[in-house]
Amino acid sequence: MAVISMKQLLEAGVHFGHQTRRWNPKMKKYIFTERNGIYIIDLQKTVKKVDEAYNFLKQVSEDGGKVLFVGTKKQAQESIKNEAERAGQFYVNQRWLGGILTNYKTISKRVKRISEIEKMEEDGLFEVLPKKEVVEIKKEYDRLIKFLGGIRDMKSMPQALFVVDPRKERNAIAEARKLHIPIVGIVDTNCDPDEIDYVIPANDDAIRAVKLLTGKMADAVLEGQQGVSNEEVAAEQNIDLNEDEVVEVEEVKETSVESN
């Protein structure tokens, strides 16, 4: 049985690609047709690719590996954080800071600062320091949590990367490839699939599409950790795909054009 159904994909708008004038020819094999200037992704291939990505991440998790979830575009930020936390994994959902993977020794010093500030507050140091200094320290803490909070417990390199939109996350992908870390990615019709080891051809602009697919990847990790079946994970998550309407394709894609 497939990890995800065609009905789920359709209701989440996963099949809507980018405008035909904004495409990468390497994605041709994942395109079903064109409609009103928008490429329609072949969901039969998406179902198959989701299965492949799911099984890979499940195996990574079974082997005790960790996955770094990356999605810094507005449509992905909430899902990336929520699903990574649900699965007990690492995440980056704000700006990717150069060296998170390739220069982690330096980045880890900044991560360590988070705990240092927390200990300062616990020990009552904020009560004796000048108020202005405390305000600045708290601002520093908020910045660190915003950009590095999702990797504060990452003591070693992740065994896999999951990204939403390879174009947006090209710096993260470049670092992962340099370190030979396998990459799973939601890849829209304007992206280069060659950069991704496990391609999930899908709409990377609709919030519901991103949420659905990111949730499935988190399920894979949980199944690997706990040895539970797909059905048990789905029942526990109790996803109701009918609670929101699919975002208008034209509006979503035009917003993406402006942001890029």
From Swiss-Prot:
InterPro entries: Ribosomal_uS2, Ribosomal_uS2_bac/mit/plastid, Ribosomal_uS2_CS, Ribosomal_uS2_flav_dom_sf. One of its GO terms (molecular function) is structural constituent of ribosome. One of its GO terms (biological process) is translation. Keywords: Ribonucleoprotein, Ribosomal protein. One of its GO terms (cellular component) is cytosolic small ribosomal subunit. HAMAP family: Ribosomal_uS2_B (MF_00291_B). NCBIfam families: rpsB_bact. PANTHER family: 30S RIBOSOMAL PROTEIN S2 PROKARYOTIC AND ORGANELLAR, SMALL RIBOSOMAL SUBUNIT PROTEIN US2M. Belongs to the universal ribosomal protein uS2 family. This is Small ribosomal subunit protein uS2. The lineage of its organism: Bacteria, Bacillati, Bacillota, Bacilli, Bacillales. The gene is rpsB.
